[in-house]
Amino acid sequence: MDSDSDAILREPPPAGNELDTLLGALERQRGYVAWKCGNLDSAGLRATLGPSTMTLGGLLKHLAAVEDDVFSVKLHGRDRHPPWDTVDFGADPDWEWHSAAEDSPGQLVSLWQEAVSRSRALVAEAIADGGLDRLASYTWPDGRTPSLRRLLIDMIEEYARHVGHADLIRESVDGLVGEDPE
């Protein structure tokens, strides 16, 4: 994310239908992440704030993992994509956070962008195969199966939580603040 064009913040439609509003809200959160993690070197992506070990690089890698887990594995029942397909999360449940320090900014950004691109295609596939009511390919421990609608809400929540973290970390790196790159 070397340019502001990577971090275009798209507003959801002010009076859109449910699908356009959900997808718009998710894309807006992705845009915030792109902006807050953009144009940083390795030191910026490895910076921490206070006692936390969270970094913007770890955040990018984590969100790439979540994109893959939610839309490839849970929604469609497909195998994990690399690098997640060879990770022993039982040995290190936070592997993506810990291993991000070994990756270059370009690797982290590419990993996240590729995961987002795959997710967009997988969501479009699910929309064509049942819309927001399409059920996921997995069930919760209590036997219920979430719909695409629920998975989109969960992803919006995941991103919104981490955008708050990204705001604080990025401000500590170089003073960048705000909600809009304009």
Where are these regions (language model features)?
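Short, contiguous alpha-helical
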Residues: 2-5, 9-11, 19-38, 42-94, ...
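Charge-dense, low-complexity intrinsically disordered segments
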Residues: 9-16, 20-23, 99-106, 110
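Acidic/histidine-rich alpha-helical segments that form the ligand environment
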Residues: 92-134, 149-155
